[in-house]
Amino acid sequence: MKKIIVLAALILGFSVAAAAQPRAIGLRIGNGGEISYQHTLGQNFLEVDGGLGLGFDGVFNVGATGIYNFMIAQPQWTDRGEWGFYAGPGATVGLGLGDANYLTLAAAGMVGLEYTFWFPLQLSLDFRQHLGFSFGEKPFWAPSSIALSVRYRF
Protein backbone atom coordinates (compact mmCIF):
# COMPACT_ATOMS: atom_id res chain seq x y z
CA MET A 1 0.00 0.00 0.00
CA LYS A 2 2.85 2.35 0.86
CA LYS A 3 4.43 1.75 -2.56
CA ILE A 4 1.14 2.55 -4.30
CA ILE A 5 0.82 5.86 -2.43
CA VAL A 6 4.43 6.80 -3.26
CA LEU A 7 3.90 5.84 -6.91
CA ALA A 8 0.66 7.87 -7.09
CA ALA A 9 2.40 10.88 -5.52
CA LEU A 10 5.26 10.64 -8.04
CA ILE A 11 2.87 10.39 -10.99
CA LEU A 12 0.86 13.35 -9.69
CA GLY A 13 4.05 15.36 -9.15
CA PHE A 14 5.31 14.67 -12.67
CA SER A 15 1.90 15.57 -14.10
CA VAL A 16 1.85 18.91 -12.28
CA ALA A 17 5.44 19.65 -13.37
CA ALA A 18 4.60 18.82 -16.98
CA ALA A 19 1.51 21.05 -16.90
CA ALA A 20 3.61 23.92 -15.52
CA GLN A 21 5.97 23.81 -18.53
CA PRO A 22 4.30 25.61 -21.45
CA ARG A 23 5.21 24.34 -24.88
CA ALA A 24 4.42 25.54 -28.38
CA ILE A 25 4.55 23.91 -31.79
CA GLY A 26 3.96 25.41 -35.22
CA LEU A 27 5.54 26.73 -38.40
CA ARG A 28 8.36 29.21 -38.99
CA ILE A 29 8.18 30.71 -42.48
CA GLY A 30 11.13 32.72 -43.82
CA ASN A 31 13.57 31.70 -46.56
CA GLY A 32 11.90 28.31 -46.31
CA GLY A 33 9.50 26.48 -44.06
CA GLU A 34 10.42 24.93 -40.74
CA ILE A 35 8.59 23.04 -38.04
CA SER A 36 9.16 24.96 -34.83
CA TYR A 37 9.00 23.73 -31.21
CA GLN A 38 9.44 25.85 -28.07
CA HIS A 39 9.81 24.72 -24.47
CA THR A 40 9.72 27.29 -21.68
CA LEU A 41 12.49 27.02 -19.09
CA GLY A 42 11.64 29.52 -16.37
CA GLN A 43 11.65 33.02 -17.87
CA ASN A 44 13.58 31.86 -20.98
CA PHE A 45 12.86 29.22 -23.62
CA LEU A 46 14.52 26.67 -25.87
CA GLU A 47 13.53 26.72 -29.54
CA VAL A 48 14.23 23.84 -31.93
CA ASP A 49 13.43 24.27 -35.63
CA GLY A 50 13.81 21.72 -38.40
CA GLY A 51 13.20 22.13 -42.09
CA LEU A 52 13.47 20.76 -45.60
CA GLY A 53 13.95 22.80 -48.72
CA LEU A 54 15.09 23.04 -52.29
CA GLY A 55 17.57 25.85 -52.84
CA PHE A 56 17.89 28.04 -55.92
CA ASP A 57 21.02 26.05 -56.80
CA GLY A 58 18.99 22.82 -57.15
CA VAL A 59 20.31 21.37 -53.90
CA PHE A 60 17.94 19.59 -51.52
CA ASN A 61 18.56 20.90 -47.99
CA VAL A 62 17.69 19.48 -44.59
CA GLY A 63 18.67 21.20 -41.37
CA ALA A 64 17.99 21.75 -37.69
CA THR A 65 18.63 24.72 -35.41
CA GLY A 66 18.54 24.86 -31.64
CA ILE A 67 18.54 28.23 -29.85
CA TYR A 68 18.33 29.13 -26.16
CA ASN A 69 16.44 32.43 -26.05
CA PHE A 70 16.56 34.88 -23.17
CA MET A 71 13.40 36.90 -22.57
CA ILE A 72 14.78 40.45 -22.54
CA ALA A 73 11.59 42.44 -21.89
CA GLN A 74 7.85 41.87 -21.64
CA PRO A 75 6.14 45.24 -22.24
CA GLN A 76 2.46 45.60 -21.30
CA TRP A 77 1.24 47.10 -24.59
CA THR A 78 -2.21 45.49 -24.50
CA ASP A 79 -4.78 44.58 -21.84
CA ARG A 80 -4.96 40.97 -23.03
CA GLY A 81 -2.19 38.70 -24.22
CA GLU A 82 1.55 38.95 -23.63
CA TRP A 83 4.36 40.63 -25.60
CA GLY A 84 7.99 39.61 -25.38
CA PHE A 85 11.38 40.65 -26.79
CA TYR A 86 13.90 37.81 -26.87
CA ALA A 87 17.39 37.02 -28.11
CA GLY A 88 19.72 34.09 -27.83
CA PRO A 89 22.59 31.96 -29.13
CA GLY A 90 22.43 28.52 -30.66
CA ALA A 91 23.76 26.10 -33.25
CA THR A 92 22.75 24.78 -36.67
CA VAL A 93 23.54 21.59 -38.52
CA GLY A 94 22.55 21.11 -42.14
CA LEU A 95 23.01 18.77 -45.07
CA GLY A 96 22.80 19.59 -48.77
CA LEU A 97 22.30 16.86 -51.39
CA GLY A 98 22.22 17.25 -55.15
CA ASP A 99 24.61 18.90 -57.61
CA ALA A 100 26.59 20.14 -54.60
CA ASN A 101 26.84 17.94 -51.51
CA TYR A 102 27.86 19.53 -48.23
CA LEU A 103 27.57 19.37 -44.45
CA THR A 104 27.13 22.64 -42.57
CA LEU A 105 27.97 23.40 -38.94
CA ALA A 106 27.29 26.93 -37.71
CA ALA A 107 26.72 29.13 -34.71
CA ALA A 108 23.36 30.89 -34.78
CA GLY A 109 21.95 33.97 -33.13
CA MET A 110 18.37 35.16 -33.05
CA VAL A 111 16.47 38.26 -31.93
CA GLY A 112 12.70 38.58 -32.09
CA LEU A 113 9.36 39.90 -30.91
CA GLU A 114 6.47 37.61 -29.96
CA TYR A 115 2.84 38.05 -29.05
CA THR A 116 0.94 35.33 -27.20
CA PHE A 117 -2.83 35.69 -27.40
CA TRP A 118 -5.17 35.05 -24.45
CA PHE A 119 -6.12 31.84 -26.29
CA PRO A 120 -3.41 29.27 -27.18
CA LEU A 121 -1.91 31.00 -30.23
CA GLN A 122 1.46 32.70 -30.55
CA LEU A 123 2.83 34.89 -33.37
CA SER A 124 6.46 35.94 -33.59
CA LEU A 125 8.72 37.82 -35.98
CA ASP A 126 12.44 37.16 -35.73
CA PHE A 127 15.80 37.72 -37.36
CA ARG A 128 18.27 34.82 -37.36
CA GLN A 129 21.93 35.00 -38.40
CA HIS A 130 24.20 32.00 -38.98
CA LEU A 131 27.98 31.95 -39.15
CA GLY A 132 29.83 28.73 -39.83
CA PHE A 133 31.54 26.37 -42.19
CA SER A 134 30.37 23.99 -44.87
CA PHE A 135 32.32 20.89 -45.66
CA GLY A 136 31.97 20.21 -49.36
CA GLU A 137 31.13 22.68 -52.12
CA LYS A 138 30.66 25.82 -50.02
CA PRO A 139 33.57 26.57 -47.63
CA PHE A 140 31.97 29.44 -45.69
CA TRP A 141 28.35 29.83 -44.72
CA ALA A 142 26.69 33.00 -43.34
CA PRO A 143 23.01 33.22 -44.30
CA SER A 144 20.44 35.27 -42.44
CA SER A 145 16.67 35.20 -42.47
CA ILE A 146 13.64 37.10 -41.26
CA ALA A 147 10.74 34.82 -40.44
CA LEU A 148 7.18 34.83 -39.18
CA SER A 149 6.18 32.01 -36.83
CA VAL A 150 2.72 30.80 -35.92
CA ARG A 151 2.54 28.36 -33.00
CA TYR A 152 -0.09 26.55 -30.96
CA ARG A 153 0.68 26.73 -27.21
CA PHE A 154 -0.07 23.78 -24.96
Stretches with model-predicted labels:
Residues W118-F154:
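Predominantly the C-terminal beta-signal and adjacent terminal strand-loop region
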Residues I35-H39, A64-F70, P89-V93, G109-Y115, ...:
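Residues on the lipid-exposed face of transmembrane beta-strands in outer-membrane beta-barrel proteins
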Residues A19-P22, N44-F45, A73-G84, D99-N101, ...:
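Short loop/turn motifs that connect adjacent beta-strands in outer-membrane beta-barrel proteins
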Residues I29-G33, L41-Q43, L52-F56, F70-I72, ...:
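Transmembrane beta-strands of outer-membrane beta-barrel pores
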Residues Q21, I29-G33, N44, G58-A64, ...:
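Residues that define the transmembrane beta-barrel architecture of outer-membrane proteins
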Residues M1-P22:
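Cleavable N-terminal export/targeting peptides
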Residues R23-A24, G55-D57, Q76-T78, L97-Y102, ...:
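Outer-membrane beta-barrel domain signature
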Residues R23-L27, L46-G50, W83-A91, L105-A107, ...:
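Transmembrane beta-strands of outer-membrane beta-barrel proteins
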